[in-house]
Each structure stands twice: as structure tokens, then as C-alpha cells.
Amino acid sequence: MIVVKVGGSLGIDYDALCADIAELWKAGQRLVLVHGGSAETNRIAEALGHPPRFVTSPSGYTSRFTDRETLEIFEMVYCGKMNKGIVERLQRHGVNALGLSGLDGRILEGKHKDSVRSVENGKVKVLRGDHTGTVERVNTDLLELLLSSGYLPVLTPPAASFEGVAINVDGDRAAAAVATALRAEALLLLSNVPGLLRDFPDESSLIAHIPASDVESGLEFAQDRMKKKVLGAAEAVAGGVGRVVFGDARIASPVRAALAGRGTVVS
């Protein structure tokens, strides 16, 4: 079992990704795909007159502030355009993919966090009306049912709160939770960079390996969204996942390349 998370940033080759996944699936590889959609969500939000707002926590993590209107735009893009676009690509390759959000069947479940602390102009502010959370429970029964029935699950945020409310969750950490719950042998975090870079954005500064015992040392070099990927990797290896790879989703055969060790390998 492997779990593949593909980001939603510009430059990602979804056609190559889906072609690669289809070949692996047809060869018998059990797999769950988790995806994002940040760039398209930003574009649609701007077009609808509700531009995205990002906040930085006191610990340095950046996330999307998700008020109710933002959540509705988020669902429209992630669950609609992005999810069905990926499912359609896989179906064209003969894979019976099934697109679901974490809200469906409570596949992903966690605690709703109504407020978030944000550093603005050097001061810490508390912003209320946030619809975010962290995945604490994965419905593995439903995922295993789908897999055993021949369906390839294509998952995306939002998740469900314990009260049944939709919450925005970080996709990388959600994928780590899925990989842990399914006891995956590998978690592949694919994005629009070749891996963790020692000197971002210099792609020649790729860090090839990080010991599993010292994953969080990667936070020293992680910039912006990569910080959440490193955090997700740490959670995955702590949960028993065999290895995590930060790989490049812009190249041909990105999944097999990551499985072969191209990128940053955490093991």
C-alpha cells in the first residue's frame, strides 16, 4: 500500500501523474491518492471577489484563513473541479477511480478549530470564524471496502468535524494520517519542486536524504508550504509509515520516480 499526495500549485503535470498511477494500479499496486488545489482556489476566489487570506502562526506555519465563504469556494474547487478532473483522467486510463472528500462517509475526521492565532505587523492576533482543523481519525473501513471492491480512492479536503461540520485540513498532514491508518509502506508527497531544498529556490541544493529519527531537522530548510510537508512526514514516520519521499510532480512518471528515490527520502 502506498499513499500519494499531489499538491495544487502551478506547474504540476496531472496528466503524467495519472498515467503513472494507472500503470501502477493495473500492475497490482494498492494505492490511495490525496490531492490539493491551492492555486486554482486562489484564482477562483480572486475572480469571485473574495481573495484568499493567508495567516502565519507564531510558530511560523502559513495556512489559509477559512471563513464560511472561503470554505464554499474551497469545496467548489477541491471537491468539484480538481477532484473530478483527476478522476476523469484516471477513468480515461481505465482506472475505476472514485472521488470523495474527507467529509464523505467521515473518511477524515477531526476537531473544529474556530479561531486561529496570526502574527500581523509583529503582533499576535486571534482571528475568529475559522473553519479549520486537524485530522484525528480516518475511516479505514470505508477505504478498505473501496479498495477491495476495485476502486481507487481519490481523496481531498475538507474533512468532517466531530459535529459533522466541514473543516479545511492540511492536505499533506491528512495524507500522513491516511498513510498511518492504512499502514502504508510509503507516503509520497509530490509538488512543484524536486524535494526539500537546502537553499530554496535553488533546485541544485536538493537534500537527498533525511534520517527518519531526525525528520524535523528539515524544518530548518523548509520554506512556506514545505513546512507542513515536513511536519506531515514526521507524523507519518512516527506512525509507522516505512518511508516518506518529497518528490517532483512536474516530471514524467513522478510516482515511480519517487518510489525509486528521486527527491528527498525520509527513511
Describe the function of each predicted region.
Residues I2-T62, T66-S267:
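C-terminal catalytic "cap/lid" subdomain
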